[in-house]
Amino acid sequence: MANRDVERVGKKNRGANNNYFYEESSGETHWTSWLIPAIVVANLAVFIAVMFVNDCPKKITGPNKECVARFLGRFSFQPLKENPLFGPSSSTLEKMGALEWRKVVHEHQGWRLLSCMWLHAGIIHLLTNMLSLIFIGIRLEQQFGFIRVGLIYLISGLGGSILSSLFLQESISVGASGALFGLLGAMLSELLTNWTIYANKAAALITLLFIIAINLALGMLPRVDNFAHIGGFLTGFCLGFVLLVRPQYGWEASRTNTSRTKRKYSMYQYVLFVVSVVLLVVGLTVALVMLFKGENGNKHCKWCHYLSCFPTSKWTC
């Protein structure tokens, strides 16, 4: 909660910027968003590199197996029966850094906890995540700058990977969903910790909770890593209380009126800040220790597997 922002690069448009949900002071700073577009470009570049390495026509042989979109040459997709998302094979993803519990724990490849968030199972998976990132991330970066948003994105992605590794140990996992849910969690905690500056509190809260609920519900479908979503969301939720705190509404005006001096931050903002820092440090530390000790989260929580896939008459998990 420093008095001055360290993010000077890309700072623009100091002045009022109308927002339906909250009231802004005339001196509030807005940044040009460049990090989120750069992350999108990086993810696209990584996907192209993965498809180049995959080289489906060279590896797929036999009359009953055919690469999808063969006109793309070595960039063509695996057969739909193998990958319905129009992407590479599981072996290629594993080779390129997918999250795989045994390799992380027994082969000491902890870097996979971060590398997996730059990989995607297919073009549908990639486009869905990147469109969501643009929709969510650009607004946050414009309001809070690239340093804070970048930290939330990376640390939330790590948190999602850790929780996924603790509960899903028989499959590989890829995607930026954990980081995306971290941004959603940060948006929710930002709303709560900056509650006094919001003009349309109920509308903002209901809209955000609806988006979060729908996405978490979709995570209960088969082949979706909802543990990465939950881990990323919880990490981002705590980080929002730490990194996205705004001064109280009217604090700037009170600085020139000594008879009505107002504290820059409320007491509840300080409390949420401290509690969130403690939860983050303790939670990530305990989770990492459990992971590298080879613990299986399902043994400690018998019902938790329903959070990632809920069986119905239409599908099995």
Swiss-Prot record:
Catalytic activities: Cleaves type-1 transmembrane domains using a catalytic dyad composed of serine and histidine that are contributed by different transmembrane domains
Keyword Signal among record annotations: no
InterPro entries registered for this protein in UniProt: Peptidase_S54_rhomboid-like, Peptidase_S54_rhomboid_dom, Rhomboid-like_sf
Keywords assigned: Golgi apparatus, Hydrolase, Membrane, Protease, Serine protease, Transmembrane, Transmembrane helix
A single GO molecular function term of this UniProt record: serine-type endopeptidase activity
Knockout or disruption consequences: No visible phenotype.
Enzyme Commission code(s) on record: 3.4.21.105
Gene Ontology biological process terms in this record: proteolysis
Subcellular compartments: Golgi apparatus membrane
Transmembrane segments: 33-53, 118-138, 149-169, 172-192, 202-222, 224-244, 272-292
One Pfam family cited in the UniProt record for this chain: Rhomboid
Function per UniProt: Rhomboid-type serine protease that catalyzes intramembrane proteolysis. Can cleave the Drosophila proteins Spitz and Keren. May function in pollen elongation.
Family, per entry: Belongs to the peptidase S54 family.
Name of the protein in question: RHOMBOID-like protein 2
Originating species: Arabidopsis thaliana
